[in-house]
Structures are given as C-alpha cells and as structure tokens.
C-alpha cells in the first residue's frame, strides 16, 4: 500500500483553543488596574471602545485610587503679578503644582508646591493659550502681544522648555483644543490663508485643518477654549460659545448664562463641560438638551480667583479669599465628587484645604490638569 493510501497520522498538537493569547482579564483585577493606571489618560476614550470590561474599569472609582497610589495626576496653576516701571510694565509668572503627598503612607493628602519654571524669551511678556498633554504643557501664542507662530513646550518632568515645530501662520488669541491625539488651532490670524491648522503629536507636523464655516473670523478670537467629543469650543463672551467640528469645519453657536466667569473656571470631566459662574455657581452643559444646568448639592462661596480642573476623577475647586496677613490673600481648595443620574449631576463636597497665602496682587492665569 502506498503512503498516499495510508490513514492520516495523529498529531500531538494541542487544541486550537489553547493557542489563543491569554486575555488581560485573566490577570487579577488589581494587576489590571495597575497596568491601566500607567497608561496616559488621553488614551482612555480609545480603551473604552475595546470592551465593556475595560470601559467599566476605566470609569470606576478604583482606577482613580490606583492612579493616586502612583501619583499620576497633578494640577499646575500659574499666577501673574504686574510691576509698573516709568517706561514699561513687567509681568512675572509664578507656578505651583497641586499633587499627592510623596509619603506613600498617606495617598489622599495633597500638597501645594511652588515650582521653578526657567525663563524663556517672551515668557514674562504675555499670557498664552496653554494646553496640557500628558506631562507636557504646549504654549500657543496668547493675547496682548504681536502674533506669532512659535510654539513652546514645557516638560514638567525635566523642568525644561523646548521649542516645538512652528505653526504655518502667525496667530494670537486663537481657539485651541486636543481631539484624537491632535492639537487644533482655529482662527487668530488676520489673513485669508490657513484659517485652521492641526498638529499631529505622533509625526510632530502641522498641516491645514478643515476650513471653519463661521462667516466671521472673529468668532474664533478667544481667551478660553475646551474640547468635547470631536469638537473644539470657543468661549468668547458672557453671551455665547462657538463650536468647530474637526471633521468638516462645521460651526454652531450656543448660548451661555449672562454672568461673570473666569478663563480658569472651566474644565471637562468625562466629556462634560463645567463652568463656574459668579451668580449661578457651578454649572454643566447638557449637550443632549442643549442647555446649562446647575450642579446641585453644593454650597460654594461666591468667590473670585477661580480655578477648576479634574483631579483623580473629582473636580478641584480653587478660590481666593482675604487673609489676616496684610496685603495678602489665601488660596483654598475643595474637592468635589460628581455623580450623574437621570435628574442631573449631584456634587459632594469634601473639607476645604488652605493651600497657601500669597500676595494680594497674584492673579490666576492658568489651571491645567496633567496626567502621567
């Protein structure tokens, strides 16, 4: 009998099921949480799309507790002081960071530390449109200064500045937002060329973005902007805000409460925009109903020098109030837990913490949430 007529030989290969790569969730939950805690937070929306199990862990309180153990999150606050001289005015910036205590025995205690930010050309001359990405701060040309295309990047881990790739055109007071791993800069230029451009963080290159469909280019001159979903929002005044859709440049206008608010008094947590208004208090924007709603359950002071930002899944509320020390003021912080339900968003306040006493002329310019 030929070999072709012989019956097939049995093999000792294992069944195909045993060749399947082990799942992440075959590991203990604590190990999975520690792995996720080391991933930069800007990738969390992508991970949420991978599986329901990942989405559940990323949206759980446990992930924030684990990140706290690693000291992954921090707030960077920048105050400015202005000194008047006979021939010129000088603006000086003072940086602080709010972070977890390095003492591993107490992972819930916060410390407010002054940090030394090296001088760089133009740094003390004008405020910037800053955007935090992982552990770096990208500085886009600000306002009250000749327009520029230069982008500066501050590495909070090394404590050093570096000059990034320049934009294609000079801008100032532009709308800036981070969407899908790219920085979008809209408006802020007087010419007709390149009304919007986008910076790819991977390739470190600028290219033209979809042309904004707003008829008036002044719609994008702003001093505060945020990102939600695939859109970048410009908060322009006490009456309205505009959105730019990064997919096609489409434009939409929304009303905002007629009240005083601060450039630093806005943030986005879990894809929800929060803004602190002097008269109405802390509010959030309901994108489904397209209206502003109050975060209920809070008793916040009608404070000035407001800064808010995400901090380990909670909202850090920072304000200043008069001090007993002459020509000084106190900087306070209160953490607010947020719980969303069918009826709205309920806030739970934690005890206030005195962060520092600073000179009375300290004015808050930036409040940035960074995550390692």
Curated annotation (Swiss-Prot):
Q: Give the matching CDD domains.
A: F-box_AtAFR-like
Top-level taxon in the UniProt lineage = Eukaryota
Q: Where are the Kelch repeats?
A: 136-181, 183-228
What the entry lists under Gene3D superfamilies is as follows: Kelch-type beta propeller (2.120.10.80)
For whether the record's keyword set contains Repeat, the answer is: yes
Query: Residue ranges of the F-box domain?
Result: 21-67
Where are the annotated segments for Disordered?
1-21
Bias (Polar residues): 1-13
As given in the record, the signal peptide range reads none
Q: Which UniProt keywords apply?
A: Kelch repeat, Repeat
According to the UniProt entry, the coiled-coil residues are none
Question: What name does the UniProt record give this protein?
Answer: F-box/kelch-repeat protein At2g44630
Annotated organism of origin = Arabidopsis thaliana
């Amino acid at each position: 009998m030929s070999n072709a007529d012989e019956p097939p030989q049995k093999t000792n290969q294992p069944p195909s099921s045993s060749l399947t790569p082990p799942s992440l969730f075959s590991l203990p939950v604590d190990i999975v949480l520690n792995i996720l805690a080391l991933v930069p937070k800007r990738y969390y929306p992508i991970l949420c799309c991978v599986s329901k199990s990942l989405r559940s862990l990323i949206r759980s309180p446990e992930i924030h507790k684990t990140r706290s153990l690693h000291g992954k999150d921090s707030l960077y606050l920048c105050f400015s002081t202005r000194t008047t001289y006979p021939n010129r005015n000088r603006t000086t910036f003072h940086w602080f960071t709010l972070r977890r205590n390095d003492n591993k025995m107490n992972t819930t205690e916060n410390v407010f530390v002054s940090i030394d930010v090296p001088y760089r050309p133009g740094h003390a001359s004008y405020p910037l449109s800053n955007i935090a990405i992982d552990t770096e701060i990208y500085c886009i040309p600000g306002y009250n200064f000749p327009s520029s295309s230069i982008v500066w990047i501050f590495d909070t881990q090394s404590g050093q500045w570096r000059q990034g790739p320049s934009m294609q055109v000079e801008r100032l007071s532009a709308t800036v937002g981070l969407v899908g791993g790219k920085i979008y800069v809209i408006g802020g230029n007087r010419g007709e060329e390149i009304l919007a451009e986008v910076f790819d963080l991977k390739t470190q290159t600028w290219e033209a973005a979809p042309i904004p469909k707003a008829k008036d280019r002044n719609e994008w001159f702003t001093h505060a902007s945020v990102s939600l979903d695939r859109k970048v929002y410009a908060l322009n005044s006490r009456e309205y805000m505009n959105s730019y859709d990064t997919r096609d440049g489409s434009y939409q206008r929304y009303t905002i409460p007629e009240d005083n608010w601060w450039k630093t008094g806005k943030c986005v947590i879990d894809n929800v925009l929060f803004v602190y208004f002097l008269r109405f208090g802390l509010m959030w924007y309901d994108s489904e109903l397209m209206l502003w709603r109050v975060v209920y359950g809070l008793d916040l002071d009608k404070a000035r020098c407001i800064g808010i930002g995400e901090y380990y899944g909670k909202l850090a509320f920072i304000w200043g109030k008069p001090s007993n020390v002459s020509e000084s003021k106190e900087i306070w912080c209160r953490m607010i837990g947020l719980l969303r339900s069918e009826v709205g968003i309920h806030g739970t306040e934690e005890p206030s913490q005195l962060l520092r006493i600073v000179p009375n002329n300290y004015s808050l310019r930036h409040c940035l949430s960074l995550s390692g």
